[in-house]
A protein has these predicted regions:
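A glycine-centered beta-loop-beta connector
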Residues: 1-7, 52, 60-76
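A conserved regulatory-domain signal marking ACT and ACT-like small-molecule sensing domains
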Residues: 82-165
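Conserved functional loop/turn residues at catalytic and ligand-binding sites
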Residues: 2, 27, 35, 56, ...
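Bateman/CBS regulatory modules and CBS-like beta-alpha motifs in cytosolic regions of diverse proteins
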Residues: 18-50, 62-63, 69, 94-102, ...
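A short, polar/charged loop-to-alpha-helix boundary motif
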Residues: 2-22, 77-91
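Charged, alpha-helix-enriched surfaces in structured cytosolic catalytic cores
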Residues: 26, 73, 104, 108
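The conserved cystathionine-beta-synthase
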Residues: 38-56, 63, 82, 106-116
Length: 165
């Protein structure tokens, strides 16, 4: 973003050689961000992701207790963790439901997976609107017919998607 502010306007009357000359004289210190947002090496990944999203930055310097730079965390690092958390690299079937917030719903759904011979690889809930949630989970070794027959009796669940991954 800072580089965009330093770039010449497309409406400039300078020729390409003058532009290159001016840019060659420009120093990093003249365009760098001075108020840098950082995280500590002991902070959670969730905190780092939140800071990045709220501040619209793709990377954050990571500091140790003494305030020394020890690394950098990037969007790519966050995506890698997200992929692992979602079980993307593991074979199974993913179901996504829209539902209301009901105590015991996750327990009931987990029991149906268990009773259908399955094992949950990943499970996530996402609030959407009006007290409703999206539930997305991935399971392996699932007797799909048995699972779908049992889950169809749960009126509060609306199937949004089913994907073999």
């Amino acid at each position: 973003k800072d580089l965009l502010y330093a770039s010449p306007s497309m409406a400039t009357t300078l020729d390409i050689w003058e532009l290159h000359y001016l840019l060659s004289k420009l120093k990093v210190k003249e365009i760098m961000t001075k108020e840098v947002i950082t995280v500590r090496e002991d902070d959670s990944i969730v905190k780092a992701a939140l800071e990045m999203a709220e501040n619209k930055v793709g990377a954050l310097p990571v500091l140790n207790e003494a305030g020394n730079l020890v690394g950098i965390i990037t969007e790519t690092d966050i995506f890698k963790i997200f992929i692992e958390m979602m079980g993307t690299r593991r074979n199974g079937v993913r179901y996504t439901f829209e539902t209301e917030d009901r105590p015991g719903l996750i327990k009931d759904l987990s029991k149906i997976v268990y009773d259908s011979g399955g094992s949950i690889i990943s499970f996530v809930t996402i609030p959407i609107e009006n007290g409703r949630y999206m539930i997305s989970f991935k399971a392996k070794n699932l007797d799909i017919d048995k699972f779908e027959s049992s889950v169809s009796k749960m009126e509060e669940l609306k199937l949004v998607g089913k994907y073999e991954e």
